[in-house]
């Protein structure tokens, strides 16, 4: 699996090459988390954002499809006793409906062939009134960011889509999401953080596995 092979290099990218963006992104994501929250994080990677969520929530379930990524994430969060790590697929989340107060999925939407399936799953597992938090690279119009993306593609990554700020906003509109709040963290590879609140009247269309 590609992400297992490049976990070390990706960790370097997160903490060194694009460290300032990741640090600010982690802090901004944490600002949306309450101390009573039970949080699901999908595609946690090497724990760059997990380490900011863990200190401010009641419980964090951090998941990724890559075992090597999870190993690095565990090391980053080893001092926090409220974190559980699991291997999981964001497009098929094995838990009951409306379990979590918040769901976070960082820098994964642009990699998925069917992002709508992932968004539906995130909405399914979040409680009414809860929030879905989706930080995503917006590297389409930045020369430095595009170069980094090309390097990752050269190593074997596959980007299904690349965003700028306007196309990121349009992406959610096309998926039927209105009133999406978006903030941008600028840097070498900028990141846009989308916040979607699950309305209390929204129905759940998919049954859980448990």
Report the location of each language-model feature.
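C-terminal lobe and adjacent flexible extensions of AdoMet/dcAdoMet transferase-like proteins
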Residues: 194-207
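C-terminal alpha-helical "lid/dimerization" subdomain adjacent to the S-adenosyl-L-methionine
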Residues: 13-16, 133-193
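Glycine-centered, small-residue-biased loops immediately flanking beta-strands
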Residues: 37, 130
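Class I SAM-dependent methyltransferase SAM/SAH-binding core
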Residues: 40-92
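A short glycine-rich, Lys/Arg-flanked "PGG" loop and its adjoining helix->strand segment in the class I
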Residues: 116-128
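A short acidic, Gly/Pro-enriched loop at the edge of an enzyme's catalytic core
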Residues: 91-103
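A short SAM/SAH-binding and catalytic strip from SAM-dependent methyltransferases
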Residues: 102-114
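Conserved class I S-adenosyl-L-methionine
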Residues: 1-34, 48, 72, 76, ...
């Amino acid at each position: 699996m590609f992400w297992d092979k490049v976990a070390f290099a990706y960790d370097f990218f997160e903490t060194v090459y694009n460290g300032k963006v990741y640090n600010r992104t982690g802090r901004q994501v944490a600002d949306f988390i309450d101390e009573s929250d039970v949080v699901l994080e999908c595609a946690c990677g090497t724990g760059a954002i997990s380490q900011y969520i863990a200190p401010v929530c009641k419980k964090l379930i951090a998941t990724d499809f890559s075992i090597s990524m999870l190993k690095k994430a565990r090391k980053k969060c080893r001092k926090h006793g409220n974190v559980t790590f699991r291997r999981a697929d964001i497009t098929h989340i094995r838990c009951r409906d409306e379990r979590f107060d918040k769901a976070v999925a960082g820098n994964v939407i642009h990699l998925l062939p069917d992002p709508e399936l992932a968004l539906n799953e995130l909405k399914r597992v979040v409680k009414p009134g809860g929030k879905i938090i989706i930080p995503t690279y917006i590297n389409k119009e930045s020369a430095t960011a595009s170069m980094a993306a090309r390097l990752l593609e050269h190593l074997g990554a596959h980007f299904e889509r690349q965003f700028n700020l306007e196309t990121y906003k349009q992406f959610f509109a096309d998926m039927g999401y209105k009133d999406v709040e978006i903030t941008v963290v600028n840097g070498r590879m900028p990141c846009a953080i989308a916040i979607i609140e699950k309305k209390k009247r929204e129905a759940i269309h998919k049954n859980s596995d448990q």
